[in-house]
Amino acid sequence: MKIGMITDSLGELSFEKVLETAAGLGIEMLEFACGNWSSAPHVALSRMLESADDRRAFVARVKDHGLTISALNCSGNPVHPGEHGKRHDAVTRQTIKLASLMGVDRVVMMSGCPGGPGDANANWVVTNWPAEMRTILDYQWNDVLTPYWRDLVAYANGLGVRKLCLELHGHQNVYSVETFWRLRNAVGETVGVNFDPSHLMWMGADPLKAIEALGDAIYHVHAKDTRINPTVAGLNGRLDHKAAATPADRAWNYVTLGRGQEEVWWRRFCAELRTAGYDDVLSIEHEDQALSPLDGVSKSVRLLREVIA
């Protein structure tokens, strides 16, 4: 396996400084965000789409530091009602086109979450009651999500991009193994998983069992940890809308590798991935409020180096 990083983890650094820092830490692959929920600190999407010289220079600088590109990322909600969704869909398609032009075979993203009929905002349904929840879900899946993804898969395939890697994430219609297979079975094998165990942890799933169930549908992996606060979670459960900037008040928090699950767990994680046929990048994503980005990334690199040895 190879150690990678999504460059938003060091988003305060310039493109050149990110390359220098990643190479110095022993990172081998980089994932670049192109917009939507990311500010895209290292990719000028429109300019790179227009300029072959800019694309060549970008790839050359990455290679000059002994690095390769694991994926482009456009995580957002392209099926959000109204103009919001249209803007995210445009960035999604532009990112897929850029991946095609750059010879990058993977695009990391999320499924999106529509609203209900006539809604102005997205609506993540997590219960089967009251009865209108079923009506909303049927509309979301049958009228919006599945048709959208059939069209997006055709668009990607037309550009030669064959791996759209969905992150199983809260506030998305595809947030679990079961919902992933529902979409995959409807739209085909271009859709795979960007496997990030941290979200499954706070939702109460077992990432190791999920790896076994997903098998060769895992196309890309994020390395991120979650720590459950047993006191808060024991009182309130794990559904928590308090700000990430107040981690002590929350039921769970994203943390640096090893601060949620111990090193032995991460060894099992890598072993399960290999058993499933995945022997590729582990892309570090730093979102730990308690550590600086560089400190968190450095600690994550050290842990991964131990567990993949």
Place the predicted regions along the sequence by residue.
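Gly/Pro-rich active-site loop or hairpin
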Residues: 41-49, 142, 177-181, 201-277, ...
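Acidic (Asp/Glu)-rich catalytic clusters
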Residues: 19-24, 48-70, 94-103, 150-159, ...
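Conserved, mostly hydrophobic/aromatic
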Residues: 5, 22, 30, 62, ...
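Glycine-rich, proline-tolerant flexible connector loops at the mouths of alpha/beta enzymes
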Residues: 33-57, 114-118
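C-terminal helical cap(s) of enzyme catalytic domains, especially alpha/beta-barrels
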Residues: 293-309
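Active-site acidic/histidine proton-transfer and metal-coordination neighborhood
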Residues: 17, 61-65, 78-192
